[in-house]
């Protein structure tokens, strides 16, 4: 007689968490940070048709890593949620916190009730109205529905630790757009596979957008083409290896044989 398969609830949750974390780590990294004029999104994304960064509503932006079809479903659902709330009440009632809470509830339900969790991690960003003293808001929502209110920047996907370390060392709150792009790109270059290994990050492999607080209604805009090329810092030249020092010839030649 065969025994029925049994796994504790703790083991099931642990297996689901491991599955989701591995799926997220396989993706390319995304950096979201606040700067002087709003919020900047910088994502490694060589595709020109599939976006990891997008607009949600007038003052809201969205970034995600993981399985594209899963976070694309979340993005579309977020847009519908925001449109319905803005139409039913007022456009000012659509906030980053309300969208982040809706995403957290959805991901938490999927994680606990569905056989397979979503392999995604998302960030919802918000900027205030023109002239508002309200600081930009960043909300990180993970695969299990956990939500974190981040203060300055968010790093998601890929090898996050070296990128987050580089951001902590170079981030300042008063950055302009060019400096913010430079810091984010240089941080992404630190996310190589090996220790100390740097990635080749250029314009063709980047998706960049901002939430510009100075824009009157729709704050989201993409930065592409020549405008992006002017902001990307040049790749540092590899250090040349020092030439080996020449050693003096101390060996004595054998004396000529005498006849």
From Swiss-Prot:
Q: Does the keyword Transferase apply?
A: no
Is the Cytoplasm keyword given for this protein?
Answer: yes
A GO CC annotation given for this chain: proteasome core complex, alpha-subunit complex
Q: Where is the signal peptide?
A: none
Q: Which InterPro entries did the record assign?
A: Ntn_hydrolases_N, Proteasome_alpha, Proteasome_alpha-type, Proteasome_asu_bac, Proteasome_sua/b
Q: Which PANTHER family match?
A: PROTEASOME SUBUNIT ALPHA/BETA
| Functional note | Component of the proteasome core, a large protease complex with broad specificity involved in protein degradation.
Task: Give the record's family classification.
Answer: Belongs to the peptidase T1A family.
Q: By what name is this protein known?
A: Proteasome subunit alpha
Q: Which organism is it from?
A: Rhodococcus jostii (strain RHA1)
């Amino acid at each position: 007689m065969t025994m029925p398969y049994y796994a504790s609830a703790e083991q099931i949750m642990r297996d689901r968490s491991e599955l989701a974390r591995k799926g997220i780590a396989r993706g390319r990294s995304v950096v979201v940070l606040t700067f002087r004029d709003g919020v900047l999104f910088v994502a490694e994304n060589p595709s020109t048709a599939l976006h990891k960064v997008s607009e949600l509503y007038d003052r809201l932006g969205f970034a995600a890593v993981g399985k594209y079809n899963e976070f694309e479903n979340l993005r579309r659902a977020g847009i519908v949620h925001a449109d319905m709330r803005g139409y039913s009440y007022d456009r000012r009632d659509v906030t980053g916190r309300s969208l982040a809470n809706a995403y957290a509830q959805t991901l938490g339900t999927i994680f606990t009730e569905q056989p397979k969790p979503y392999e995604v991690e998302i960030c919802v960003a918000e900027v205030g109205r023109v002239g508002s003293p309200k600081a930009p808001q960043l909300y990180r929502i993970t695969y299990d529905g956990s939500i974190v209110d981040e203060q300055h920047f968010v790093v998601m996907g890929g090898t996050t630790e070296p990128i987050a370390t580089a951001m902590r060392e170079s981030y300042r709150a008063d950055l302009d757009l060019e400096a913010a792009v430079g810091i984010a790109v240089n941080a992404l270059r630190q996310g190589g596979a090996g220790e100390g290994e740097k990635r080749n990050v250029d314009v063709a492999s980047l998706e960049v957008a901002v939430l510009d607080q100075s824009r009157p209604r729709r704050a989201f805009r993409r930065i592409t083409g020549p405008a992006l090329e002017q902001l990307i810092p040049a790749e540092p030249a590899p250090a040349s290896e020092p030439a080996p020092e020449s050693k003096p010839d101390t060996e004595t030649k054998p004396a000529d044989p005498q006849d």
